[in-house]
From Swiss-Prot:
Stretches in topological domain Cytoplasmic: 1-117, 168-178, 220-237, 408-505, 560-568, 609-625, 732-933, 990-997, 1040-1054, 1202-1249, 1305-1311, 1362-1376, 1504-1680
Catalytic activity: Na(+)(in) = Na(+)(out)
Residue ranges of the region described as Disordered: 807-874, 1646-1680
InterPro entries per UniProt: Ion_trans_dom, Na_channel_asu, Na_chnl_inactivation_gate, Na_trans_assoc_dom, VGCC_Ca_Na, Volt_channel_dom_sf
Modified residues (Phosphoserine): S842
Source species: Rattus norvegicus (Rat)
The name this protein goes by in its record: Sodium channel protein type 7 subunit alpha
Tissue: Not tissue specific but widely expressed.
Family membership noted in the UniProt record: Belongs to the sodium channel (TC 1.A.1.10) family. SCN7A subfamily.
Any one GO BP annotation for this protein: response to bacterium
SUPFAM superfamilies per UniProt: Voltage-gated potassium channels
Gene: Scn7a
Ranges for the III repeats: 915-1223
MF annotations from Gene Ontology: osmolarity-sensing monoatomic cation channel activity; sodium channel activity; transmembrane transporter binding; voltage-gated sodium channel activity
A Pfam family the protein falls into: Ion_trans
Amino acid sequence: MLTSPEPKGLVPFTAESLELIKNHIAKKCNEEHEEEDLKPSWGLEAGKKLPFAYGTLPQGTVSEPLEDVDPYYYVKRNTFMVLNRNRVIFRFNAVSILCTLSPLSSLRRAVIKVLVHPLFRLLILISVLTDSILMCMSNLPEWILAVENTLLGIYTFEILVKVIARGIWAGSFSFLGDLWNWLDFSVTLFELITRSSPLSSLPMFKTIRTLRILKIIPLNHGLQSIVVTLVQCLKKLLGAIALALFFLTVSSLFGMGLFMGNLKHKCVRWPQEDGNDVMYNGTGSQYHILERENFYYMEGARYALLCGNKTDAGLCPEGYMCVKEGSNPDNGFTSFDNFGWALLAMFRLMTQDYPELLYHQILYASGKIYMIFFVLISFWFAFYMASLFLGILTMAYEQEKQRASEESRDMDSKCHQTVKEFEEEHEGAEMETTQIEMKKRSPTSINTTLDILEDTALGHKEEPETSRKECPLCWYKFTKTCFIWKCSPCWIKLNEFADRIITHPLFDLFLVICIILNICFLALEHFPMSEELMSLLAIGNLVFIGIYTIEMILKIIAMHPYGYFQISWHIFDSILVVLGLTEMLLADIEEITVFILVPLIFIKLGKYAPPFKNLMRILGRALVALKDLVLLVSIFIYFSAVFGMKLFGRSYKDCVCHVDQDCQRQRWHMSDFLHAYVTVFRILCGEWIETLWECMEVAGEAWCIPFYMMVILIGNLLILYLFVALVSSFASYDATTEVSKEAKNLQLAVAWIKMVINCVLLKILCKEKTVSTEATDQTCDPSVKENISGHTLSELSNTQTFLRYKDQSSGTEKTPVTESESQSLIASPSVSETVPIASGESDIENLDNKETRSKSANGSSKEKMKQSSSSECSTVDIAISEEEEMVYEHEKSKLHKNGYERKSSAGQVSRESRNGKIWRNIRKTCCKIVENSWFECFIGLVTLLCTGTLALEDIYIDQRKTIKIFLEYGDMIFAYIFILEMLLKWVAYGFKAYFSNNWYKLDFMVVIVLCLSLIGKTREDLNPLASIKFLRALRVLSQFERMKVVLRALIKTTLPAVSVFLVCLMIWLLFSVMGVFLFAGKFYECIDPTRGERFSVFEVMNKSQCENLVFNESMPWENAKLNFDNVGNGFLSLFQVATFNGWISIMNSAIDSVGVYMQPSFEHSLHMYTYFIIFVVFGLFLPLCMLIGVIIRNFNKQKIKQGGSNIFITVKQKKQYRALKKLLYADSQKPAARPRNKFQGFICDVVTHRVFNVIIILLICFQATTIMIQNDEQSPQIETAVFWMNSLFTMLFTLECILKLTAFRCHYFTSAWNVHDFMVVVFSITGLLLPLSIGQYFVPPSLVQLLLLSRIIHVLRPGKGPKVFHDLMLPLMLSLPALLNIALLIFLVMFIYAIFGMYNFAYVKKEAGINDVSNFETFGSSMLCLFQVTTFSGWDGMLDAIFNSQWSDCDPDKINPGTQVRGDCGSPSVGIFYFVSYILISWLIIVNMYVVLIMEFLSIPSKRKNRTLSEDDFRRFFKVWNRFDPDRTQYIDSTKLSDFAAALDPPLFMAKPNKGQLVAMDLPMAAGDRIHCLDILLAFTKRVMGKDERVEKILSEIESGFMLANPFKITYEPITTTLKRKQEAVSATIIQRAYKSYRLRQSDKKIQDIPEIDDGREDPNSKGVHSGQIEEKASIQTQI
């Protein structure tokens, strides 16, 4: 049995089995076994169910010890298994427990039966769930203590059962061999110790108990598997985590050097006395500065205004001075004063949580120039790290999915093999008794046997019919009697009539129209609403419910109740009708309409929308497959909420005054479970810094920061993995899948209506013509074809008119298509169908002129194209690669040059006339001009100048008269130049060619814009025309190839996702309608005009009381700017919730809402948190996965069409990309030649040694450490020490520079790294010497530190730093060309929107998000605003300021100094369009940036796997070979082969143990067990590159090259191979073992034949013989 590779059947575990295991252990200790390839079976893991291929469980095998069916555990791990009645596998160690209980012990068997019983696990699960529920409750009654003691007893009993059944530590399946048991034992032991101790009331000890919630994970095998998978992903993320920590550390150190102490600068009211006060530090009187009231505060601000002493920093108002005093903002938690706070600030920037506040604080205190620092951190660091983590998780998920599919496939093959062997075993016996059995068997017995075989083969696959057959016969009679109605002929006729109605296409069309109208009626709900509209909507609701009821009745009549309820959509419709009727009866219950009925109406529309059904089907399958992961995420959120509540709940109650001056509890706390759950949910949504500040105020940094980091890191890992899994599922979305019957009927109905309209129009047109009937038919037929070309074949295949016109046009006999044939044509995706493309529609996928290309081809190619590719005949497009389109861009001049003559009919007629020759020469001249490269460069330069001048037209333009005049003349010059260019191209190419090119159309539009802007300047009433000049920046798109490529790729990847976007829009419409039903008119509140705060509900209850207040003068009953009063406002509010900007204020208004015209009350409707949580999950997360998945699918499709190349780079960049890839994949650079001078050679050896590089890296790290230990309030002694440390490091780096200059000479400056080091040394020396002469004010001490710190990038240097860093940076470097192209496009978008913002929002009142730093007054400030919006942060505050359009909020007549513009009001509609459109466009571009980098990361393993070996690889191979073959014999001994393979460098490297792999290579061996160099090289090369024709060609080239390099190769004849030699060795071992066993048995026989001596004397001879035989036996045993 031990030699069997696959134990078959279920064998009881007996004493013989235990003896075999012991013998096997003894043999393993004395022998060397080759079991390296033995691996555990995926389908036989502990916790999984036994495959059904093993048959049904025989009696006596349930809950009894069995021999393990997995050879890996049976042979290697010495285990036995137990199956419970649910076939779940349990494994135990086949060793004695506590030295007394063997596997055959009755006590242990009884305990094992208890452990494996399903009820025992159910008991533990119920206990854990009960305990988890009790943990989240507050103010528990006293009797709960008895329940907790009972649960503790159950946990203790469970531990005892596991210890007795499994043992404590012996074996891999012992109690302590499972880490989950460690957790369970620790928590239980701790709880037993502290149960009666007074320490149990402390929060820390209560927190430990919450770990019990995690016990749910080991109770579910799926959850346990997900945790193991996530741990494996975490191991793969270690390199990325190390790189992220490196970037965080470096950026924090730079932040310390740039901003240390700057955030303490505040505006202080300067005393007006004569200066008699005692001065403190030369900046002001000490007592005056320390007074908080003397700081300057903005209106409504909590912290003092920050300022700076630099030119572009924030300025103080008149009467105030900027002084460094006080604490840092945000209660001192936001600063760069030491490394810890700087690290927290950088982590906040990396996660993009409330970054706009940190931007403003730094820019106010240090200057706007430092925005560059934040751009680099946010755009590159945060973007790259997010892409890196997503890429690694995606790769891990794909590998796990591939592994699971392979193991499942292997398991299925094993199951089928087992079934086949089972059938073969029984086939012989059945053949012998065939005649007898056939006579005895009855049909029932035959069916039973077949059912058994089918069950054995299929296992868990049960057919529905089988389950229905198991029902009693009475149920079938009852169903046939009550649910299948065939009463009378009249009823049958009624049945047929109803069937004709519901199957008619117009019926489905009518239903779709009714559903759309119903949704429109729901969307018309708003506040306030007139009585007439309310009654109309109520009547409409009743009508639609009646229509749905009639539909259900007709379908029940037509299909019978039995057939009706067999379809899931019909069950859904019946639920909708029942709920609608219930709503009519219970009109007071509003929740039925909002939460149930409204979503069902929207889902009902999805039945007729194939994209919606396909997406929902994919979503359903994905969620079923990922149910364990979703459950794990839910458990983690629950655990984190309970953990936080237990840890910080008391602190939030006791220290509430630390957060609020009035000692009122804040909204976001963890005092109870609901608030803790919502707080954790907010943290996982990316907003954690504000709640962290409050937590640190009440509980301290030591507890809050670790807890928040745990929630952020683990929670984001789970969510990102779930996100990757869902995106991978939606990446398989195909819009061309089979459509439903309802959708087909809808298409047929629409086609029928179109055809009727066309026929009516056709008759009207034909009557007006006075021609014969035949001529009329001939003229009408083409139009009919054109009209029919817009429909699908399925829409018209049943119509006789279509067949008649088709017969007339083709002249052949046609056969009408039946309904079944038509539907089969539709359902088959492989059959050619007509694509519904409108007549004359332009090809949107290609912005170039494809029509010109087709016309320039010869006539034969045209005919082929007509016959082979027509959009009306096939859905398969002829793919034109991106490179061909780009080549066309370069060759378009030839096409225009060769084709312009053919496009002019007049020119063709009078070509030889004098005017014709002049016209032709003029066109040739114009063509040469516009195709000249200098002309193109000139136009490109003018385009850049024309675009760049837009940035100068800010609010200060009226004060700069010269620049204003210059711009006015410049606009005219640009207009003339572009008009001249347009005229030249008209003459050169002709109107048709010009307007057939979309880029030329864009140029023409820009010319129109320029002309309109010039006209708008001439008259004041046309001033709005002058503001559209920002559109002329769009001309940049047509002038630069990189932007063309990116825009073309974006269109190709985005347009196919329009249907998915519409589905997402419908989901948002659903939530908006629900929001209107829930919150319309409830966000109004009564505001105290004096304080600007809301009145308490005890002072004002409703609107009438608010208006009756005596001091009410300005109508304080105000509505929130963001509300749900109508669907449009609901969309905007949901958009802010989706971007997590301003969503807190929206949620606060919803949570405080009481009713219409009622004053809001603090947290009156806490259950409304549910609405926003559901929206974030189902309205944001899942639609986001859908969109990104479809975009990735389109990206991959376009990439495949282009042969696997990147679609965001040009043809020229693709060549550069290949060169860059070769350069980056090269493992080492060619070193400089070693100097011949001995001294220089010695120095060269020193500086090129790896130890020297390690020393330099350590010095850089030590220098970084000196910055970490600094802080803002350090003593002068520390500053002096830091100065001398900087001097020391400068000297050491200078010495390094001198040594390398001596060693490398002029070659030193050929490396960019060396040039950087040299510049750092020069500037560091200058930075140390300049303060001695000009003072430290101009050269800050941190400058030298930052210069020296810049050398830390050597850690990322290939070959110098960690290899894992180089591997992780490689995708970024390879995708850099594409990323730069996309960045150019997003910069152009930012530029256009910045100009638009300057024209529309430059004078908006400064409040909320618009201030002295973030505004639209200048181009730079506008770009800063748009940078914030690009990162989806801060745009809600800007929009809030733009919403000020009423007299109460702004002054429309305000005089703005220096300009003629009046007022500071905004335009809400323009602001909404501005921000929403920009966010969508920038999001789309940024998503493609993520996709580019992630796809590049995923492609690197395949590129490395498929790449050929380079010359460096072979050079290193022979370098290692020379160490093992110093005599150049071209041979090595076979015993050295393993060491040689382990000494090679990757990719030829083979780690030990590698003997099995080397033997499998079957290498030829010569006499003396030697192996030739060429054989080893060819075998290793084949292992790396695989086996195909390309590899065989490369191997032949390697062999021929080796023969040329070694012409005197020693000839030899291989006598054997490594595989044969191993087989011989194994055979010899077996023979030797058998001989030794024979010798041992003979020796035992001789010993037994020696007679015993009865007397007490001993014969010395016999004693010697006996002892010699014993020694001989012992020696034989030793040899064995």
